[in-house]
């Protein structure tokens, strides 16, 4: 799974493939809990599977915070043809879980 830097997003967005990006921060305990779930899914999900990416947005200066209106981490955003087709924002005090990932994958696969 690729770790996207801000300057690599345009290449990812210009791809015709569906992409699922997890935005996270190393200091976030909910991200540390969710990251293995995301990685396991990236390694096992096969049906019309989107390409999985992660993007570490530790720094407040990272332009992706504002560009994608990220207010909590982890946040998972699904893209197709450069457009956002679905997203899940981390819930305060909870983060994201396996059911959140499963629901965004289902939505991503049904978006055609």
Show where each model-derived region lies.
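Local sequence-structure signature of Cys/Sec-based thiol-disulfide redox active-site neighborhoods
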Residues: 8-43
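Non-catalytic, surface beta->alpha helical segment in thiol-disulfide oxidoreductase systems
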Residues: 72, 77-112
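Short hydrophobic/charged patches on amphipathic alpha-helices used for structural packing
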Residues: 9-10, 62-65
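Structural signal for hydrophobic/aromatic residues that build the beta-strand cores
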Residues: 20-21, 38, 52, 76-78, ...
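Short aromatic-centered micro-motifs
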Residues: 27, 49, 78
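Thiol-based oxidoreductase modules, predominantly thioredoxin-like and allied folds used
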Residues: 2-4, 23, 35, 42, ...
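Core residues of folded domains in eukaryotic genome-function proteins
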Residues: 17-19, 48, 72-75
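A short glycine-leucine-enriched loop at secondary-structure breakpoints
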Residues: 66-71
């Amino acid at each position: 799974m690729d770790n996207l830097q801000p300057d690599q997003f345009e290449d990812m967005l210009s791809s015709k493939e569906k992409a699922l990006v997890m935005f996270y921060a190393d200091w976030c305990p909910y991200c540390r809990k969710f990251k293995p779930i995301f990685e396991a899914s990236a390694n096992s999900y096969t049906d019309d599977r989107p390409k999985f990416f992660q993007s570490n947005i530790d720094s407040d200066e990272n332009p992706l915070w504002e560009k994608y209106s990220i207010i909590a981490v982890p946040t998972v955003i699904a893209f197709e043809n450069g457009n956002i087709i679905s997203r899940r924002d981390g819930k305060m005090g909870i983060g994201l879980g396996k059911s959140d990932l499963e629901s965004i994958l289902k939505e991503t696969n049904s978006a055609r």
